[in-house]
Amino acid sequence: MSDWDSVTIIGQKARIGGGGPRQNVAKTQAELNAARRSGNVVGTEKKYGSTNTKSNPEGQRLTKLDAVDDVVPTKKLDMNVGKAIQQARQEKKLTQKDLATKINEKPNVINDYEAGRAVPNQQLLGKLERALGVKLRGKNIGEPLFAKKK
């Protein structure tokens, strides 16, 4: 037989004849069970390296809370932080409503922070620090944010 008589097929139809079974991905449990019943080779592999997934530390914290049997109280804001917010706000002659609009929050959020009822939020504390010019995190709470250099 010469080279002129054979036909070379490129593309989708190239498997016709001796192509063998194509590898399938079973998406459901039913498909997986059907493959096992028919005697096909079944391999399960975990997908790694998905790009758009990010671990959520909040979920990890909730898992730890589920593992603990006793009731764990939520973290509340320290009272001296609330007093520092109140003093700095009054020095700048701002009401709670004025301060809230300045940092794009609701007035009751400012009220909760000043009363020490709020759960600390680092982003919101940062906004308050910049608006009032007073440190509210770490040590030296209540001191000016940008102290004058000696």
Swiss-Prot record:
SUPFAM superfamilies noted in UniProt: lambda repressor-like DNA-binding domains
Gene3D superfamilies documented for this protein: lambda repressor-like DNA-binding domains
Pfam families found in the cross-reference section: HTH_3, MBF1
InterPro entries: Cro/C1-type_HTH, Lambda_DNA-bd_dom_sf, MBF1_N
PROSITE patterns in the cross-refs: HTH_CROC1
Domain HTH cro/C1-type: 85-139
UniProt superkingdom: Eukaryota
Single biological process term from Gene Ontology: rescue of stalled ribosome
Keyword Cell membrane among record annotations: no
Disulfide cross-links: none
Record bears the keyword DNA-binding: yes
Stretches the record annotates as Disordered: 32-59
Molecular-function annotations in GO: DNA binding; ribosome binding
Keywords: Activator, DNA-binding, Transcription, Transcription regulation
Cellular compartments per GO CC: cytoplasm; nucleus
DNA-binding region: 96-115
CDD domains associated with the record: HTH_XRE
Feature: compositional bias, Polar residues: 49-58
Family: Belongs to the MBF1 family.
Stated role: Transcriptional coactivator that stimulates GCN4-dependent transcriptional activity by bridging the DNA-binding region of GCN4 and TBP (SPT15), thereby recruiting TBP to GCN4-bound promoters. Involved in induction of the ribosome quality control (RQC) pathway; a pathway that degrades nascent peptide chains during problematic translation. Required to prevent stalled ribosomes from frameshifting.
UniProt name for this protein: Multiprotein-bridging factor 1
Organism in which the protein naturally occurs: Debaryomyces hansenii (strain ATCC 36239 / CBS 767 / BCRC 21394 / JCM 1990 / NBRC 0083 / IGC 2968) (Yeast)
